[in-house]
Amino acid sequence: MNNKTFINLRRSHFQKPQPLNQQIVNLALNADSHAFLSNPASQNVYLYLTNYVEAFSENWFKKSLSELKILDWGCGKGHISYLMQEIGVQVTSCDVFGADDSSFGQNTPIIEKASINVVPLEHPYILPFKDRTFDIVLSFGVLEHVPDRLASLQEIHRILKPSGLIFCFFLPYYLSWTQRLAHLRGDFYHDQLYSKKMVKKHLLQTNLELLDIWHRQLLPKNSISYGNYRTFEVIDQWLTERTPLKYTATNIEFVACKSQLVN
């Protein structure tokens, strides 16, 4: 796979129509903290991102995703682990023990319904897994919340097998108009903002090889309901791929791999 292949695969799967998961909608309606998952525009993002993970990984490893060992790092509400289970993947889920917004500090109807076992993380960055355990690590809005980014990436490098992948989504971009607006309103939930240069530097420092990086999400998805959400998503993706407005997008995201030559 080369860079052009990575980009084409991402673009095609980001725009691939996905049926909404009604079970997630029903479960989300019973918990205010999960309400965004009942919004079609928001849930659609998680659906196409997990579809992209499946497509990229199977192209990369030349294996079915069900044959690979996957870690949902900081699984939170459990919706990513649940969606992975829905496509036949056995995923290991973990989250910080005791944090208010972790799997252990909030109502978790999806985790309970799907009987997802969540491994507690009791150290700020050390992960309770052996070296070279996983083929894939998923970070859905997690890296920006860790206290030591480099130490966490070094741990991910340690637990990945050679040529293993890390997918990092929802990394808040430092020029994002939505992040700046949130800060002006006094909301610093995302107090660490990232640039592409910063991402590349961190990956280089932790011996992870960048394969693809992109901007995503210009238009808000969680709190706004769009009449034709798929059309709005196509427009959003076009703006963040083809126009200078990408430099005000909410997120930058990337996929990287562990070199086969590095221990």
Where are these regions (language model features)?
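S-adenosyl-L-methionine-dependent methyltransferase catalytic module, highlighting the catalytic core
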Residues: 147-155, 165-262
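Conserved N-terminal segment of class I S-adenosyl-L-methionine
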Residues: 1-128, 249-252
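Hydrophobic adenine-recognition pocket in adenosine-nucleotide-binding enzymes
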Residues: 142
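A conserved beta-strand element that flanks and buttresses the S-adenosyl-L-methionine
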Residues: 138
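Surface-exposed loop/turn positions
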Residues: 68, 131-133, 164
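A structural alpha-helix within SAM-dependent methyltransferase catalytic domains
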Residues: 82-85, 153-157
